[in-house]
Amino acid sequence: QWKDGSTSWERLADLKESHPLETAEFAMTAGIDHEPAYNWWVPHTLKKRDRIISMVKRRNTRYLKRTHKFGIEVPKTVAEAHDLDRKNGNTLWMDAIAKEMREVRKAFEIIPDDQTAPIGYQKIPCHMVFDIKMEDFKRKARLVAGGHKTEAPATITYASVVSRETVRIALMLAALNDLQVKAGDVLNAYITAPCKEKVWTVLGPEFGSEAGKGAIIVRALYGLKSAGAAFRAHLASFMRQMNYTSCKADPDLWYKAETRPDDDTRYYAYILVYVDDILCIHHDAMSVLDRINECLPLKPQSMGDPDIYLGAKLRETRLPNGVWAWGLSPSKYVNQAVQNCQTHLTEKLGGTFKIPAKAANPFPENYCPDTDMTDPLDPECSSFFQHLIGVMRWMVEIGRVDIAVEVSMLSSYLTLPREGHLEAALHIMGYLKQKHNSRLIFDPTYPLIDESDFPEHDWTEFYGDVSEAIPHDMPEPLGKEVDIRMMTDSDHAGCKTTRRSRTGILIFCNLALIQWISKRQPTIETSVFGAEFVAMKHGIEILRGLRYKLRMMGVPLTGPSFVYGDNKSQVTNCSVPESTLKKKSHSICYHAIRESVAMGETRITHISTGDNLADPLTKCTFGAKRRRLLGNILYDLYDDFN
């Protein structure tokens, strides 16, 4: 019944989607929550409501309740900072405030006493946030604007974030073309950019004698919704002044054609931007950083060889074959995550759950999260489980390929996790505690590819005169060429409840692992043959995007990508023109893969299951098989000192 007294019939599914809470509460009040249309959905919806309310309450009180960090009392206001310094007999907090104000003062333009804020400008609050650095317990103060009071800008609001696969490609190219890699961190990055919003504020006590005066915010102050986009635009204008061009495949990668002075060979220099972290790849990278420093001040201690990037330790390594290559090691991030997890279990959850002392593998043998029927977690434990999955997914992104399939499996239960799922996540943390050392090396060495394993055929009769689409606006290819290989696999009906299969994909540029995927397939396949088709089609689509990105980065790419699969029937069906379509349900995958082969974009061959490195991304593996396959991907993981 509507407010005007009229009535109408509405689909229950529509009401569940548009007004879930009201519908669930009505079912409870009317006593029909036991009906088939409600019996599972109502308690799930109400539990979700309670969880959201609980999380909001915790977030509102978390900052106020936290009084200490690393055993040091942290103030909430400038007045409290003064009191703490007087009580402790030092000026540590006031020094931190003074340091912040020296940098941020230029972001404010005082409004004369006889004037008011310009018409159209919105008043917002500003406040000081305090923190303590873990490395040296140094006090830190940051003045932030109350951007939550303003409307979201119509244009983009995000900062520069270069993709992870672009970082891996760039590091491999640096070693391949013998280029330097240097890093820099922009000092107070957002403050260097002009403010895009019309806002003003009343200055607080941190401004000293100017406290109480009105001021227009003229710089992209931290906290403003447009601050990230403002800095991004400011940085982009400077990159263009340096004659760098934004890559169309990844706008936060900037490239420029350069000539090496020692042998006059031409190549592309790259600048990668991740918010305020800059990675420069050039034959004289420090000179580029010095020029950037003239416009965007860089932290002096950050300029030079890279140390930590994206949460992982980045360093150059000499391989057994004598080649120098860059590698990412997330060991420090892993150790800190395990330590934080142990602290939370002890202090917040009262020791109810524990990290196992020994865990040789990410999952216990014979454990399956799909069939776990333990009790659902309460809201606090559910939130902790979701936090753990987020942390471990980032570990996978920065190189822990060995836990990819287990984390992917648990990620399917974020909305309704059970006690067994949390215990499985803690088992992964126990495994990481034991196997914390690992390195992902971006080896530029060319792989040994026997092209006789990839026979060519005439596909004209079946697909006509097709050819790979080459971007018309790609830059001139410079530098050394790369080879691309992909290994695909699937675990047919691996999910015990939905019977969906799991895809595993590994993509290499030369010997450098660039992309990896462990993901449930969207369809339910009735055969191993069909699941392998879906996996390879997914891989072909990713390969096409990677080939486009490489070309838009100016990387020479003349040959096809070499694809390996371990299902001989499916490989033959894809690579031999006369092979026929066996099921109509496979027609899209069948033609998509075969057309890729016909246009010369890919070539496909068979590989034994024992040699398929993508196998550990489709299902949990154990013992010698796991050591052999993952040992070919990650360095240090199974070394004796681990």
Positions of PLM-derived features:
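A short, polar/acidic, helix/strand-boundary loop motif
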Residues: 151, 507-534
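Catalytic palm subdomain of template-directed nucleic-acid polymerases
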Residues: 190-203, 222-227, 256-259, 263-299, ...
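RNase H-like nuclease module associated with reverse transcription
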Residues: 412-416, 483, 522-642
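Mobile genetic element proteins and their domesticated derivatives, centered on retroelements
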Residues: 11, 78, 97, 104, ...
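Catalytic-core region of right-hand nucleic acid polymerases
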Residues: 20-21, 28, 108, 116-118, ...
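C-terminal reverse transcriptase regions that engage the nucleic-acid substrate
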Residues: 168-171, 221, 304-451, 608, ...
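Conserved beta-strand/loop block within the catalytic cores
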Residues: 90-168, 246-274, 450-451
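Long, charged, low-complexity intrinsically disordered regions
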Residues: 1-76, 92, 96-99, 106
